Amino acid sequence: MAAKKGVKTSTKKSDYYKVEGNTVERLKKACPKCGAGVFMAEHLNRFACGKCGYLEYKKNEKTETEE
């Protein structure tokens, strides 16, 4: 018999917003394909959407040459 799968815990969506007075600021980037309700995961060199698989690579901000 196969082992039973555990219950997945949902993420706490309130951690993705910052409220100051009457303004709300999103702390994570939203997916351009899925819309404003789906946030993208931030990795070392890219942003990824877990719902549709959209990838956006970060730009290298290294403009100076290392000596």
UniProtKB/Swiss-Prot annotation:
Q: Which domain of life is it from?
A: Archaea
The free-text note explaining how the cofactor binds reads: Binds 1 zinc ion per subunit.
Q: Which GO terms describe its molecular function?
A: structural constituent of ribosome; zinc ion binding
Q: Where are the zinc fingers (C4-type)?
A: 31-52
Its required cofactor(s), as named, are:
Zn(2+)
Similarity comment text for this entry: Belongs to the eukaryotic ribosomal protein eS31 family.
| Name this polypeptide is given | Small ribosomal subunit protein eS31
